[in-house]
Amino acid sequence: MDSRVSSPEKQDKENFVGVNNKRLGVCGWILFSLSFLLVIITFPISIWMCLKIIKEYERAVVFRLGRIQADKAKGPGLILVLPCIDVFVKVDLRTVTCNIPPQEILTRDSVTTQVDGVVYYRIYSAVSAVANVNDVHQATFLLAQTTLRNVLGTQTLSQILAGREEIAHSIQTLLDDATELWGIRVARVEIKDVRIPVQLQRSMAAEAEATREARAKVLAAEGEMNASKSLKSASMVLAESPIALQLRYLQTLSTVATEKNSTIVFPLPMNILEGIGGVSYDNHKKLPNKA
């Protein structure tokens, strides 16, 4: 390939400011000299018109005869602007908050949602922000909207609800790459709210309720099974030890007397309880082992 033929990216970059910087011609120097002479003649009145104050968080892009002076922004502090030939534009370098209004999005699983967000960005190159784009803030705002719709359109509803941070980071990376030539650096992207249709909300709530009920039934069944195992073990211990049964009997009487002190309890003798059961502990011991 001929080395004189440049790639599309190279040609694209050459259209931006800062690549082809030409000095002032003869006419430019003549106009510059006349403007400077005018300042000297009208001194000290002209000095108040030529001196401009640039704040700490601002930069001034000075155009001299239509060309950016010194190929960089000036400030902070005092700058000199010559009359008739110099024009300057102030650029705020502080972080800007860009609220993205609710965007109607069709997800990958064919669910219509409304998603809004916020983008935090700042200008790091005042020259690029002024010379490479007409309205840098409006361009960033529109690009943030389209990027949000494009990225969320490739995700399912469950992925959007569960992976907000990953999606926001992906949007931030795409925006940062796209706005680099505009002198913009995207600091952070946040997805504020995801609105889904009311009917879908009801179906999701019913599904979640059914899942919770099924989980509760499983836990209750496991608890009853564990309790039945414990009761079985306790009954076997009490059957093997009549003294333990008597102690349990006395403990129950003490508990009833403490909790319900207005109730009079007449304890039955153990031999009567054994008679009601149909067999005494002594007879139980005398029964032959069927095994």
Swiss-Prot record:
SMART domains hit by this protein: PHB (SM00244)
One Pfam family it belongs to: Band_7
Keyword terms, alphabetized: Cell membrane, Membrane, Phosphoprotein, Signal-anchor, Transmembrane, Transmembrane helix
Cellular compartments annotated: Cell membrane
GO biological process, one term: signal transduction
TM segment ranges: 29-49
Recorded topology in the membrane: Single-pass type III membrane protein
The keyword DNA damage belongs to this UniProt entry's keyword annotation: no
Function according to Swiss-Prot or TrEMBL: Required for the function of many mechanoreceptors. Modulate mechanotransduction channels and acid-sensing ion channels (ASIC) proteins. Potentiates PIEZO1 and PIEZO2 function by increasing their sensitivity to mechanical stimulations.
Assembly with partners or alone: Homodimer. Interacts with PIEZO1 and PIEZO2.
Protein name: Stomatin-like protein 3
Record organism: Homo sapiens (Human)
